[in-house]
């Protein structure tokens, strides 16, 4: 049985198009066809083919948003349901709501730019682009599927391409970084499988793993706490949460520029999305008790990673720890019981995806010219690479949350949402906000000092001998320009993004607040006994644009 339900479709034809299935299958089928693409030996035809596939995928996701997605609805849209293995409860079920649609668009957008960033790759280009396209389909599937077993399969599918992209095209320690990545991520994925099976078979009868069926089940509080803890570990590795983060600096330290963009731009967001989708939406009673822990872990992420970034002399590792620090705001937003704070967490994921991808692409472009990642060996290249310096400066300012940039809006929404969240006691809110503010202060210090060490001062003798200290080429300017357009656009007018998911966030927060009200004895005195009312509408957050 095949069912389509494209809510909000603008025309009858759009209502019959399986947009999300196409966005998953086009890159996967495109990857399977890569071995059959004729090539003259330099990989040129394969590059253009892969770029075409990623652009088609991006256009499909944009068409899905324009023709079949209605931001004013909070429920599931673009639904597709095909009975697969009914005896085992397996169904091909995909759909999109405010939690997933923005991330689907982000995935297809960044992957198309990563494909363009991979243009200089000359070693085994056929295999490289095969893995890149397979990863694209797997990541879109993570956000689009509506069945927990399918989610697990998609989660595992994208791990294999990342492992091979690290192990084959990475740096000197690529085998170590790739092995550490797969051990952390694949090992923690076992908790997802166990939780999926436990939740699917809960209550007896025919098992069902669809999100709607799981949300309708009345899980006991002890069962919810156990599943929540396991899923928190699995998703905490991918986010990542300190101390489950150590794979990320090693992976970033050895990855190439396009893999950097996919890791920072998309992979980390899978952890944040999964926390909202499963821990908050399907296990609300457990979330009401774990939320203070998420807040504390978020502060640890912000401060610890910012301080560690200070000590890094390797450019890639410095930006990697900066990413971990910024993802701490996602944890605080997810742990808040306010629509504004949770909306800020969602916007922070999108904002960091764009900013992180731009910074890591610039790291790769800089390494191609200087052939070093050590800040001690850099300096004085600003005169020879003025455009590159300008691109670095704008992206660094975006990362330190300059007003008018998307990072400023998202972090301010998290702060404002948590600070005004009456679900927590006032002393707890004051302490958390003050500690998180320390990370905000540290960020411009280590980012601006990094720019000074790269571009200012006296040029090192080792760099003088290089003849390839050329300025940014048009391809590089185009990639950064494409990333800066939404960064600045969201910073100046946040409703460009917040309107696409505000209704879903309100519904999610309302569910969590309802669960908190049913808890008669909170796990800690950090949470008040009485929950506040859910904010009525979150269309345009009251955040200054500049």
From Swiss-Prot:
MF (Gene Ontology): NADH dehydrogenase (ubiquinone) activity; ubiquinone binding
GO BP field: ATP synthesis coupled electron transport; electron transport coupled proton transport
Signal peptide feature range: none
One cellular component (GO) term of this entry: plasma membrane-derived thylakoid membrane
Membrane topology: Multi-pass membrane protein
Reaction catalysed by this enzyme: a plastoquinone + NADH + (n+1) H(+)(in) = a plastoquinol + NAD(+) + n H(+)(out); a plastoquinone + NADPH + (n+1) H(+)(in) = a plastoquinol + NADP(+) + n H(+)(out)
EC id: 7.1.1.-
Predominant localisation class: membrane
Transmembrane portions of the chain: 17-37, 48-68, 103-123, 127-147, 149-169, 181-201, 222-242, 256-276, 290-310, 327-347, 348-368, 389-409, 430-450, 477-497
Any single Pfam family the record assigns to this protein: Proton_antipo_M
Record's subcellular location: Cellular thylakoid membrane
Top-level division of the source organism's lineage: Bacteria
Alphabetical UniProt keywords: Membrane, NAD, NADP, Plastoquinone, Quinone, Thylakoid, Translocase, Transmembrane, Transmembrane helix
Biological role: NDH-1 shuttles electrons from NAD(P)H, via FMN and iron-sulfur (Fe-S) centers, to quinones in the respiratory chain. The immediate electron acceptor for the enzyme in this species is believed to be plastoquinone. Couples the redox reaction to proton translocation (for every two electrons transferred, four hydrogen ions are translocated across the cytoplasmic membrane), and thus conserves the redox energy in a proton gradient.
Entry's family note: Belongs to the complex I subunit 4 family.
Protein name: NAD(P)H-quinone oxidoreductase chain 4
Organism encoding this protein: Parasynechococcus marenigrum (strain WH8102)
